[in-house]
A protein has these predicted regions:
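Alpha-helical cap/lid subdomain in secreted, periplasmic
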Residues: 110-254
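Bacterial signal peptide processing site
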Residues: 27-29
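Acidic/histidine-rich helix-loop elements
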Residues: 69, 97-105, 141, 182-183, ...
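C-terminal motif of bacterial Sec signal peptides marking the signal peptidase cleavage site
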Residues: 22-25
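Serine-esterase "nucleophile elbow" of acetyl-processing enzymes
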Residues: 33-100, 114-120
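Bacterial N-terminal signal peptides that target proteins for export
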Residues: 2-15
Length: 254
């Protein structure tokens, strides 16, 4: 029996096409015979799972960091930690270390950090210091030099990565019932000098600086922003601090 060349060519091409189709189909799935039954083993897209992360935060400062006259969970480092927990995956964990005490100056804070000797592997560090330098009448030159020293110490606590430091401005206690006992404008003018120095240094060295002083200057008009001691910020005031700190903190540790 002789096939017409035209039909032979057609049959040949059809056969080749079928073989190619079968070949590529086999590349997409394989069949495995188990206990006499054919099971299809279809490759699945590999989904990369996020591994649990542990973030370590350290906050350095004075009464504004330790949260004088508010509950432990009300102080701003705790509120910041809790806000980060809500933002990140449930499997992630956060640790918070605070080195701060009411009345501390820059000198006191430097000594305390040296004494505590915290590890250098933190994910984020905050620094808020200087009000007691002003209140105790320490020379401004002391703040100028020791603030820079504290910035460098803080950076060392996050693996020498300045992008993981947030400097927070000094609150203004002039706008509290206690602060009203002093000459109007005197406290605010001095604290402006402290904050301006810190802000300029941070700008020059590409360090994040968060200004919260204006929040505390609403304390007379809005007494809810002042704690029960008539001097320090309330939990509400600290929550407003965190509103400004949170997006920056997320960006730094994400």
């Amino acid at each position: 029996m002789h096939l017409n060349k035209k039909y032979f060519k057609s049959y040949f091409l059809t056969g080749v096409f079928t073989l190619i189709t079968v070949f590529y189909s086999c590349q997409d799935k394989t069949e495995v015979i188990t206990n006499g039954a054919i099971q299809e083993n279809i490759p699945q897209d590999i989904v990369e799972e996020n591994l649990p992360q542990n973030f370590k935060i350290i906050s350095l400062g004075d009464s504004y960091t330790i949260g004088q006259s508010v509950c432990e969970s009300c102080r701003f480092p705790e509120q910041l930690k809790d806000s980060l927990i809500l933002y990140f995956d449930e499997q992630d964990s956060f640790e918070l270390e605070i080195i701060a005490q009411t009345g501390w100056t820059t000198t006191n804070l430097i000594s305390a950090i040296e004494s505590f000797n915290p590890p250098l592997d933190h994910s984020l560090v905050t620094l808020l210091i200087g009000v007691n330098n002003q209140y105790q009448g320490r020379p401004f030159s002391v703040y100028e030099s020791e603030f820079i020293e504290l910035v460098n110490i803080a950076i060392s606590l996050v693996g020498d990565d300045p992008s993981r430091l947030i400097v927070v401005s000094i609150p203004d206690y002039a706008y509290t019932p206690f602060g009203q006992n002093f000459t109007s404008g005197y406290i605010s003018d001095q604290l402006d000098n402290y904050n301006q120095y810190a802000e300029n240094y941070c700008l020059e060295n590409n360090i994040s600086y968060v200004y919260i002083t204006d929040i505390t200057r609403e304390g007379i008009e809005n007494p809810a922003l002042v704690a029960s001691d008539n001097l320090h910020p309330s939990a509400l005031a600290y929550s407003k601090f965190v509103e400004r700190l949170l997006p920056i903190a997320i960006e730094k540790i994400q």
